[in-house]
């Protein structure tokens, strides 16, 4: 069912270390409004969609969100590249380093680990799609905040791409939501 393409949906080539941005951006990997939560939410919900069209849409977007999580992980890894333990300490990343070294771990910018409580799957297509539209808007807002915090075009451009994908996903969910309402679901 899944096919892995060995390239990112958008190229990541960050040349400058920026540990504060790494700390902020990790939230889109393992935070409540991040890409892993979105992928699991949509993948779980697809099984209760009443039409093949709905199942396919949620599966397609879930798969895309996994690609976005890989982009975020690549960004964090590149932003941390070459950092000393002292630099990690100065950036407030010591607890991250203590538990995970230079590895990428699904948590938010405060170090709170990912939890399945971030996702919702009601078994009701209308409730799920409203949840999905809200999730995409929250992710869009987080990307806008990250863009505001960034000053490196190598960071800003992938964030702009990810922000735009949230808007596309919102619109796709809205189209399906409106279709289901018109069909009496």
Regions found by a protein language model. Give the residues of each.
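Non-heme di-metal
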Residues: 1-185
């Amino acid at each position: 069912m899944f096919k892995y393409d060995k390239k990112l949906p958008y190229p990541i080539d960050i040349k400058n270390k920026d540990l504060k941005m790494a700390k902020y951006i990790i939230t889109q990997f393992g935070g409540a409004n991040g890409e892993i939560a979105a992928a699991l939410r949509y993948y779980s919900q697809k099984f209760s969609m009443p039409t093949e069209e709905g199942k396919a849409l949620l599966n397609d977007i879930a798969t895309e969100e996994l690609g976005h999580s890989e982009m975020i992980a690549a960004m964090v890894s590149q932003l941390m590249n070459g950092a000393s333990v002292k630099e990690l300490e100065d950036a407030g990343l010591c607890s991250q380093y203590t538990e995970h070294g230079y590895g990428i771990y699904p948590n938010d910018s405060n170090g709170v680990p990912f939890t399945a409580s971030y996702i919702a799957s009601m078994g009701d297509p209308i409730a799920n799609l409203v949840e999905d539209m809200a999730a995409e808007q929250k992710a869009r807002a987080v990307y806008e905040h990250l863009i505001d915090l960034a000053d490196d075009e190598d960071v800003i451009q992938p964030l702009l791409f990810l922000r735009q994908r949230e808007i596309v996903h919102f619109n796709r969910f809205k189209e399906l939501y409106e279709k289901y309402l018109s069909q009496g679901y």
